[in-house]
Amino acid sequence: MDRGRPAGSPLSASAEPAPLAAAIRDSRPGRTGPGPAGPGGGSRSGSGRPAAANAARERSRVQTLRHAFLELQRTLPSVPPDTKLSKLDVLLLATTYIAHLTRSLQDDAEAPADAGLGALRGDGYLHPVKKWPMRSRLYIGATGQFLKHSVSGEKTNHDNTPTDSQP
């Protein structure tokens, strides 16, 4: 089987295309003689460069993503700086914080004379989380509340709010 093609490709399923593939390989410009060619043989003088470039690009992408998650974690007000969180933990806390801010803005719009500006209303959001085996249980209630409130809030808000979308 040719290592350059997937196992399910039509050319690897029959025996006839093998001579055709060999003829195409041998007719490439720059080929001077018989010998193994393609990914399985021949000299590998230039084949390491694309792999190294791909690896460097992937390392850069992962590093950028890691820095973005750390920055997002730093913006969460209830998470102490020494807390180790997984990416899922950071995303869940960020979504619950955004939901809390959204609900606070909606509550402020409904009752602007409310004296408790910025006070947390105790809805189960913004848990300070340390690494411990049962930390996932913290999110079960918070995300469930978030999903229930956001879905019901969207249904009622679509009927009551004006369609002006500019801030």
UniProtKB/Swiss-Prot annotation:
InterPro entries: bHLH_dom (IPR011598), E-box_TF_Regulators (IPR050283), HLH_DNA-bd_sf (IPR036638). Residues 49-101 form the bHLH domain. Pfam families: HLH. One of its GO terms (molecular function) is DNA-binding transcription factor activity, RNA polymerase II-specific. GO terms for biological process: developmental process; regulation of transcription by RNA polymerase II. Residues 1-60 are annotated as: Disordered. Residues 32-45 have a biased composition (Gly residues). Residues 1-23, 46-55 have a biased composition (Low complexity). Keywords: DNA-binding, Nucleus, Transcription, Transcription regulation. SMART domains: HLH. The keyword Nucleus applies. It is found in: Nucleus. GO terms for cellular component: nucleus. Its main location: nucleus. Efficient DNA binding requires dimerization with another bHLH protein. Putative transcription factor. This is Transcription factor 24. It comes from Homo sapiens. The lineage of its organism: Eukaryota, Metazoa, Chordata, Craniata, Vertebrata. The gene is TCF24.
